[in-house]
From Swiss-Prot:
Entry keywords, A to Z: Ribonucleoprotein, Ribosomal protein, RNA-binding, rRNA-binding
An annotated GO cellular component: small ribosomal subunit
Protein purpose: With S4 and S12 plays an important role in translational accuracy.
Molecular function terms, GO-annotated: rRNA binding; structural constituent of ribosome
The protein's name in its UniProt record: Small ribosomal subunit protein uS5
Length: 164
């Protein structure tokens, strides 16, 4: 569900910058890998990675990549519709809806994704690996799994009032 229009103002946040080395015959080749999350704080978020010999260039490439991978996040008021547990690699992320006014209870990479998605109230727990790229991927995977009550009712062939 990627969006193509670049007219939307997207906020970007650098989650991680990693110095990577390739050993060649003549010595070591240094490059920088950047992980960036972009979002409009209104239900759309994406992440991207970029690699280059200079940090700003790696960030630019990552932002470009992130804009190509935007997803839509269903929300109920200021929180998510239901609890979700998602995995990617060794990372597991648990996202739970929270009451209005409780804020974003999330750490590091999860916080960046949740805030830029525009979710104001959520509780999260990172389990397993804490590698930033896998945490971000698991979080985005979890947000993709979210469904509104209307969607669930339609899939089951019943009305929303019968769902409860």
């Amino acid at each position: 569900m990627a969006f193509k229009d670049n007219a939307v103002e997207l906020e970007e946040r650098v989650v991680a910058i990693n110095r990577v080395t390739k050993v060649v015959k003549g010595g070591r080749r240094l490059r920088f890998a950047a992980l960036v999350v972009v979002g409009d704080r209104n239900g759309r978020v994406g992440f991207g990675t970029g690699k280059a010999q200079e940090v700003p260039e790696a960030i630019r490439k990552a932002v470009e990549d992130a804009k190509k991978n935007l997803i839509e996040v269903p929300m109920v008021g200021t929180t998510i519709p239901h609890e979700v547990l998602s995995e990617f690699g060794g990372a597991k992320v648990l996202l739970k809806p929270a009451v209005e006014g409780s804020g974003v209870a999330a750490g590091g990479a999860v916080r960046a994704v949740i805030e830029l998605a525009g979710v104001a109230d959520v509780t999260s727990k990172s389990l397993g690996s804490n590698t930033p790229i896998n945490i971000v991927r698991a979080t985005v995977e979890g947000l993709k799994q979210l469904k509104r009550a209307e969607e669930v009712a339609a899939l089951r062939g019943i009305s929303v009032s019968d769902l409860a």
